[in-house]
Every structure is written in C-alpha cells, then in structure tokens.
Amino acid sequence: SNVNPADVESVTVLKDASASSVYGSRAAYGVVLVTTKSGSAGKASVSYNGTVGFSSPVNMPEMMSSVEFAGYMNEMKVNSGKNAPFTESAIERLGMFTADPYSEEYPGIGLNAAGDGWASAYNNQYADTDWFDYHFKDRSLRQSHNLSISGGTQKVRYMVSAGYVYQGGLIDHVEDDLDRYNLNARMSFNVKPWLKAAFNNSLAVTGIDRPMADQTIFYAQISDKYPTQVTALPVEGDYDLPSWNEVMYLKETGFERTSVSDAMSLSMTITPLDGWDITAEMKGRLDVQKSSFIMGFPKTTRPDGKVVVTSGGKQGYQYPGMHWKNTSFGSYTR
C-alpha cells in the first residue's frame, strides 16, 4: 500500500508451486510482484502528473423530520399503553422552529423543570436536526502529485521520483484526513560487461488524523440521535448539551498515526557465461509507527453560566481523560 502508483511499471502474479519454489513456504498462496520504473540511457527526462478530485458520501440514511419523529414516537408510546411524550404545543414548536431555526423566538431549547439545566429531547427541546447531514460533508478534497526525473548513460542509469497524496475525510467539524509522501530512487550500474549492480530505495511517510481510532461506533451513535435534539444553544461558552452528543465529544478527541517505511535493496549480477546469470541480493526494511489517542472531559455551560465537566459515561469508543501513545519498530534483512 506504500507503493506510489505512478512509479509502477508492471504487476506480475506468481501462483502455487512457481511462487513457493522462489519465495519459500510463505508464498504458498501466491506472490504479487510489483516492478517499479527504472531509468534509461539518454538525456534527463522530467515528468509530472497530478490529479485533483472530490469524494462524496454515498447511501446516506435519510432522517425523518422532527415533526414526523414526534408523531411516530407518540403513536408508539400510546400503543404500548404509555403517555404520549410530545404535547401538541411541543409539536407546534417543532414546526415553527423548522420555519425559523435557532432564532431568538425559537432557540431550539428551553430550561428543564427545575430550571437549573437544559430540557430533554421531548417537550422543551424542539430542533429539527439531520444528524447525518450535520456530521458529514457533502464533498471532500482529494489530490495526488508526482514528479520524476530519469536518465543516464550506458554505464549508469537512474530514476528518482517524489509523490504526495492527500485524502480528506468526510466527517465534518473535526480533523479527518490522510497525507502520504513517497520518495523513490532506482539506480543501475554496468560496471563491467560481466558485472552489473543495482540499488533501490523506497521511502514512504504516512500521516493519519482522525477524531477517533474506531469510527464504526460513531456511525451507530449518530444514527441513534433524535432529530429533536439541538446542535447549538442560546448561551455563549463551552458546550452545554442535555444528553449524550457527539458534537462536543468529537472536538475533545483525537487520533493520530504516523508511519515511516523505508525499504532498500542492493544487488550484484555476474555473467560468467552468456545466458548464465548469478545474482546476489541484500534487502533491508525499516518500519516505524507512532499512534496517539487523546480523549478529554468536555466542559459544559449551564443556563446560569456555571461550567461543569461531563463524565461521558456513555461514550463507547474509549475511556475519557486518556492520552495513549504507542511506538513500534520493525526491520529485517534478507
């Protein structure tokens, strides 16, 4: 996955016994050989190619409106022998809010019964929120750029390339993207008519920035949110939401991973007789990966201006207040 597609010259698949005979037991199910481009004798040649595009979410669920939600919720509760949670006046406010959202007259939320906090998502909280539309972008930028220079003489040939890939994520209001840098060098030497040498080096640096390590639970959390819950409050200050809400938690979390992979090879080929090549090859690879996960305690502002710390007991993807780092190294020589 670290290979720059612009540097690929050919892809060969070896299967079954043919792969095992060359690469051993680990290749019993086959081997994919990726050959990168190399330089040719002649003047230096400079090449550039780049692409810019956009990604968009597909098959996104369509949430019902808050008025529809209130009607179905009332019907469900009544059919189960319980009281309807939404009053007629609350449903009327839902409709008025939709026409003039987050206005001074319809801020979307009021006080709870005790007057010391915000109301729940029933009678005195009357938003019309499409949580999928709120949390996901309509489109996100993606781009790639590749620059290479190649050339050489009958004795020495070279090919050096650099690439950059950016893929923006689709989650809105937070950092969600990937950056990758590639640097490849491929050189070949005709030392003698019977002696050839080659050196290859492939370096890749990848950075991933996400709001969380596992985003699967995030999708489940937002699909469980009521459309009657607000995304904003009529007070200034830190977040203050009456129930679990991804808006404030996503801004307090962070997952970063930086990976560095450097693969090198040096080979020499001796041709004692025409048609008989003897090749000696040495390979080395260094992989370094550092991961960091941060999740804090979001602060919330009450209607009276007091700031409290939210424990976040319902958060499913990690414990709060944790800053976790991991660094791993690996290398081999063959």
Label for each model-derived stretch:
Residues A6-V8, A27-V31, K43-S47, A263:
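Extracytoplasmic
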Residues V3-A6, Y23-A28, D176-D177, A213-Q215:
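Short, glycine-/polar-rich solvent-exposed loops and beta-turns at beta-strand/coil boundaries
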Residues K155-Y158, W194-A197, W276-I278:
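Repeated loop/turn-to-beta-strand initiation elements of outer-membrane beta-barrel proteins
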Residues T36-S38, G151-T153, F189, N201, ...:
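Residue-level signature of outer-membrane beta-barrel architecture
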Residues V11-T12, V32-V34:
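Non-catalytic regulatory/gating segments with a bias toward low-complexity or hydrophobic composition
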Residues A41-D128, V165, G169-A263, E281, ...:
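Surface-exposed loop/interface segments of Gram-negative outer-membrane beta-barrel transport/assembly proteins
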Residues L33-T35, S47, N146-S150, R186, ...:
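Outer-membrane beta-barrel architecture
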Residues S1-D16:
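Short acidic/polar hinge/loop motifs at secondary-structure boundaries
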